[in-house]
Amino acid sequence: MNGSTAEPVLLPGERLEPLARGVSVIVGGAHTFNTDTILLAAYSLPRKGEICADFGTGSGTIPLVWCARADPAFVGAVELQEDACSMLERSASLNGFTGKIRVIREDIKNLSSSGILLKGTLDRIACNPPYKPAGTGIQSEDGSARLARHETACVFSDIAAAASTLLRWGGRFCFCMRPERLCETLEILHAAGLEPKRLRFVQQRQEKAPFLFLAEAVRGGKPGLRVEPVLLVEVGNGSWSEEMLAVYGEYKENHR
C-alpha cells in the first residue's frame, strides 16, 4: 500500500507532478515524462508479484505508475544519470515505495555482466528508448535531453540484448518506438531471441497517421504476432478518448 512517508525534498528547478491518486513524481529539466511514457506504463502493467525492471527510467515515472496501479514484488529502475537517480530515490521515499523500487545507476550495456540483476530472473522489462539514431535529427545542446532522444549512450540492440539476458524464459519485454523504425526493431528482437507477440499503433486522431507503436516481445516465445486495435488519443471533437482517459485520466484530472 502506498502513502507518503516523507516531505518532498525539491532541488531548484524541480517540481512534483501527480501520476495517480496519492502518487507523485519529482521532475525537472530534461527528466520529465510525456504521453508516450504513460501509455507504455499502462501497456506494460505488471501482474501481482512479478519481478520487473525499467531500463532508462529517467525520473522513474514507469516504476511509480506500476507500484501505484499494480503490485509488483520488485522493480529495478535502471538509469545512467546521477541527477535522475536522485529524483527517483526521493520520489520512491515520498510515495512509500522504497521497499519495492531499487534505483540502479548503471549503463544498460554493462547491466548483464554487472550481476546487479540476476540473469534469467525477471518477469517483465519495460523501456522507453531513444527514438532517433545518433547523428540524425536536431541534436539537443542539453546532454540529458540528447541521451533521452538520440542513441548516443546505447542503441536498441543493446537494450534488446540486455532484456533477453535478464528475462526468464517466457518473460516479457515491452517498449515503445516511432513507426518508421518498426521493421528494424522487429529484426533486432528476433536476433536477440525475443519473439514479438503484441503490437499496437497510437494515433492522435482517426485521420492522422500513427505517431507511436507499443510492442511486447517474449523471450523464447512461439511465432505469432497479434496486431491490436489502434489506440486513439482524441475523438472527433478534440476531447480525449475514453480509453485515453482510462490510462491517463487521473493525471489529466489533476491538471484541469
Regions found by a protein language model. Name each.
Residues 209-256:
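SAM/dcSAM-binding transferase cores
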